[in-house]
Amino acid sequence: MACIVEDPQRAGQSNETQIALISGVPDDISKSCLARVPREYHMAMKCVSRRWRDFVCSDEMCDYRNEFNLAESWIYALCRDISGGVFLHMLNPFSSRRSWKRINDYPYIPMREGMGFAVLGKRLFVLGGCGWLEDATDEIYCYDAAMNTWFDVVPPLSTKRCYFACETLDGKIIAIGGLGLNPNAKRTWDIYDPLTRTCKSCSDVNIVPEMEDSFVMDGRIYIRGGVGGSSTAVYSASSGIWERMDDDMASGWRGPAVVVAGDLYVLDQTFGAKLTMWCKDTRMWIHIGKLSQLVMKQPCRLVSIGNSIFVIGKDCSTVVIDVENVRKNKMNGVMVCSSIPKTWDDDIDVISCKSVAI
């Protein structure tokens, strides 16, 4: 994947490139060896030398690990504390001591709300937003998970917006609807292409107002909004148009949604928390089970890794659901799941969650 942000200039890099990654070993073999090191050790590897650091942080390293199924997905939660400050928490689900950790402070928009959150490759993007004393903005910021660094991204969104849906499709970031200085913003969407560094705006009357939730499945973007989330629409990149969502499918979309192995799961938080699945063959919603309220606090966000759904609630209280085994392991209708407790006393709201594979 091509570089999509401006990296800081590194002094003396030309001299370092003449030094082998591993003494006496060709660089292609050295890169193959380094790419096989588990992700939890990458931070230590960056301390060995500048060349090791540059390779570990590179798109080449990320692409190699993805190509040979070596990539490991970590979860990143965009959070807000009681003071209104915005920051990131990270979870390594493969660690023997699974716990959330706060990472680099978010330096640009400490009090902003209604932001979009998206991931492309090894980079997370925070888009738009507004504040009590700040109008909707078109700014885009990028966090490189390999470099552990924030960057300012250009160009900005075509439309200043907040409280909008944000998804990635075909290698592009799509910001949909929401509110903005332009009253027509709620009927528009922006397509940001990181390869060409261009952002174009499109409009369609079928885009639903007051955006609440969205997901991507089978090459389409689904959005839900309106009063009580009663309006839905679906976008196909091949046609470039928005259409009304199927009524049967829309009827069961009553909470945050996530796609696992091509199947759609929804966490209905109307009365407690219950997990449902959309069956494509019968075109019906199937009740999977309930979640215990003792290990998590609503409202919750969902993110998937492999066959597992991570239900992330207030204060980053987390429940892990294995969708292959959950139907067999239930007690009185309550799903048997593993949990990851919070490790701090602060009051934290989770805005959005994404996984980044490196």
Curated annotation (Swiss-Prot):
GO terms for biological process: protein ubiquitination; response to cold. Kelch repeats lie at residues 78-122, 123-171, 173-219, 220-269, 271-307, 308-355. The keyword Repeat applies. Pathway: Protein modification; protein ubiquitination. InterPro entries: F-box-like_dom_sf, F-box_dom, Kelch-typ_b-propeller, Kelch_1. Pfam families: F-box, Kelch_1. Residues 20-67 form the F-box domain. Keywords: Kelch repeat, Repeat, Ubl conjugation pathway. PANTHER family: F-BOX DOMAIN-CONTAINING PROTEIN, OS02G0202900 PROTEIN. Part of a SCF (SKP1-cullin-F-box) protein ligase complex. Interacts with SKP1A/ASK1. This is F-box/kelch-repeat protein SKIP4. It comes from Arabidopsis thaliana.
